[in-house]
Amino acid sequence: MLLKIKAFFLWLTTPLQKFLQQVGNQEALMTSDQVDRCIQLIEPGDILLSYESGRPTSVFIKGYYDHAALVTAKKSVIEAVGDYYIKNPRGTKKNFGGVRQVDLEAWLFKKDSVCIIRPVYDLDKHKVDHNKIASRSVFFYEGLGYDYTFKFGNETIYCSELVYASYKKNDSMFMHHIPENKEILPNDYYTACFESKRSDMFFQIIYEARNG
């Protein structure tokens, strides 16, 4: 019942979320040294968490980090955002946000804080490279619309769900410690570095730059 009430509230506030996504722009805090360090360390399949103090929509998201994205096989970033942007790759006339590919360096410079998280798999137990597979699978979702209701299983997708879906395609146990009836938030990937109990993989913080 509580989940239905929450879903209804998020649906009800969708116009407000869309408006807030467009306002709230202020100068980001990531430095050139921090961005260079990130670029040196980042690998395909890495999960990027970020925080932007100028995002009023952050009030809808629990935890410090308010956004999650995935590093692609091309070393670009694919993310699901609520911002308006030009030309939906799937050809709809009007785009109210969704999944897009952006340049890694440009993405980093827009942030106040960034955390790089890497799912590390035991290669003796896994015969495939899940990180590389996820970094390719994520392209399947490019052009999908943004999910303002934060619900699994519909035709739209939100930021941390995009990361989840890209890994879940080939790793059925990915983020299995999160209850199925709970939405996955950006900060869940951060806490997974300390709370995940799997014996065949773990989540590792590769680098973190907190400026706000």
Q: Can you name each region flagged by the protein language model?
A:
Residues S32, R37, N131-A134, A192:
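Charged, low-complexity, helix-prone segments enriched in Lys/Glu/Asp/Gln
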Residues P89, Q101-L104, D122-K127, L185-P186, ...:
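General structural signal for secondary-structure boundaries
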Residues F109-K182:
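Active-site nucleophile-His-acid catalytic modules used for acyl/amide transfer and hydrolysis
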